[in-house]
């Protein structure tokens, strides 16, 4: 996808999709590493390991630094790029898992709201698999009030969703093949619904921000420089993954996650992702 088209679509509709980014070998490597970890632990990958997983796993570190992903992100937010967060989204086969209509940046406490999410499909993420649904142009709204819910099938840790009626007749799907990604604005209304396929739907969502964005949260935020230079130093600097899946790395990851969840869950009426201090 050319730079001008990427910029235009992002400005007009709030999203860009699909964008080809990964080779089959890169897809296989990511899936193999995820499945190896699951085999070692004896259970499907879940919180906290699925969150900020670029600080645990080589495949995730590779993807947050992937040049094709960063080239497309740079078209939208410029050359100096921080990774603010990243999450592995796994919908089991034939599951009731869903994500409510929401705006990503509601509890990110970033100013200005120039955050963009790259959602990378590691398996097929079509309509049957519960691909992302978006409301084109909704990113031109301000942040709308959200509320929390405790539905165990809601994949968002604090269960947040828009506290308004969403005009879903305007929604469009963003189906992706494995190896493709979508990009969407932090204010874009989006959701996803049940996976009706016989296989898991696996996607990797990466939150990118330009270095000039300021942290306005009560709890300071960490961020990882992935391209360019950071002359602003608005975030606590994060070290790049050094020793994948080592005890030292697990400890560092846990410290980052405690900081992040404290920040994200402030004022939450419910959270599936609280971590003890």
Task: State the predicted function of each range.
Residues 1-7:
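Short, small-residue-biased leader/transition segments that mark boundaries at the very start
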Residues 37-40, 79, 125, 141, ...:
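Phosphate/oxyanion-binding loops and surfaces in catalytic or ligand/nucleic-acid-binding neighborhoods
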Residues 49-53, 69-134:
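Conserved double-stranded beta-helix
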Residues 103-115, 169-170, 176-177, 199-200:
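A short beta-loop-beta micro-motif enriched in histidine and acidic residues
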Residues 127-193, 213:
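Double-stranded beta-helix
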Residues 8-72, 95-98, 188-277:
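Non-heme Fe(II)/2-oxoglutarate
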Residues 15-17, 117-121, 131, 171-173, ...:
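Conserved hydrophobic/aromatic beta-strand scaffold that supports enzyme active sites
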């Amino acid at each position: 996808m050319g730079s001008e088209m990427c910029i235009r679509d992002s400005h007009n509709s709030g999203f860009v999709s699909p964008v080809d980014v990964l080779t089959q070998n890169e897809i296989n490597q990511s899936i193999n590493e995820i499945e190896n970890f699951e085999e070692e632990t004896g259970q499907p990958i879940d919180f906290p390991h699925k969150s900020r997983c670029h600080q645990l796993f080589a495949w995730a570190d590779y993807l947050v630094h992937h040049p094709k992903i960063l080239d497309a992100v740079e078209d939208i937010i410029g050359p100096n790029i921080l990774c603010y967060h990243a999450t592995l989204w796994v919908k089991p086969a034939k599951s009731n898992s869903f994500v409510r209509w929401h705006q990503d940046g509601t509890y990110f406490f970033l100013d200005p709201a120039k955050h963009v999410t790259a959602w990378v499909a590691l398996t097929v993420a079509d309509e049957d698999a519960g691909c992302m649904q978006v409301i084109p142009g909704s990113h031109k709204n301000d942040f709308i009030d959200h509320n929390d819910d405790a539905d165990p099938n809601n994949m968002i840790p604090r269960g947040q969703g828009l506290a308004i009626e969403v005009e879903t007749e305007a929604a469009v799907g963003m189906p992706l093949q494995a190896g493709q990604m979508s990009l969407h604005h932090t204010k874009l209304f989006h959701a996803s619904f049940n996976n009706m396929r016989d296989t898991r739907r696996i996607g990797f969502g990466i939150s990118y921000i330009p270095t000039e964005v300021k942290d306005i949260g009560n709890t300071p935020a960490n961020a990882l420089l992935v391209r360019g230079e950071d002359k602003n130093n608005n975030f606590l600097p994060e070290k790049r993954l050094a020793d994948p899946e080592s005890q030292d790395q697990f400890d560092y990851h846990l410290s980052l996650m405690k900081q992040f969840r404290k920040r994200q869950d402030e004022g939450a009426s419910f959270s599936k992702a609280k971590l003890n201090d």
